[in-house]
Amino acid sequence: MWTHGWWTHGERWPVKPAEARTWARARGYGQYTQAAVSTDGVHFTVQPAITKTSYLRVFTRGSSSFGVSRLGLVSRAQSPLAEFTPGPNLFRETPYAGRVRHVALVVRGNRLLVFFTAIGDAPERIFMSKVELVADWSEWRASGFTEVLTPETAYECANLPNLPSEGGDINVPVKQIRDPFVFEDAGRAFVFYSTCGEQGIAAAEIDVP
């Protein structure tokens, strides 16, 4: 399991969240990723390697592990438990460059499907893009953007104003869906996502090519 959170060298944080973020960023800290392993799904042992990116989603190809994280950055490691080395942005030279919030990954042969939402969209909603997994991973690029889900129901706050989303957390209901995760079982695919910004969790069955 890969987890992320604000990381420091052990210094004590300010108590209030807004002050803590300002304090951490001024010292070069950020939301980083670590792996944790478990044999029973209950008790986990945190691994020492720290990857300096957040919201990392990982898949294995050949002898390497690859991850895609916030903003669409792709990275590589020789082991899924090692520190990942940053590479290019999958979304470079696209309208989503630097705006990708969270991603979900599905591998189909030599193609990677990336489900994501983008900061600044009105409304923020889920898209799918395709990445052809050519031999040189520095050449991987996202293309072919398809809308998967957009807020349409009351539990997704579709009745609220249609405003561009912003980076960071949100503590009030808004017309946005975020944070996709794709789960496949017995030939069916479901996407789990947060609703009204970050006020709930929903799921929908989708067609995954």
Over which residues does each language-model region extend?
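Carbohydrate-active catalytic/glycan-binding domains of CAZyme proteins
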Residues: M1-P209
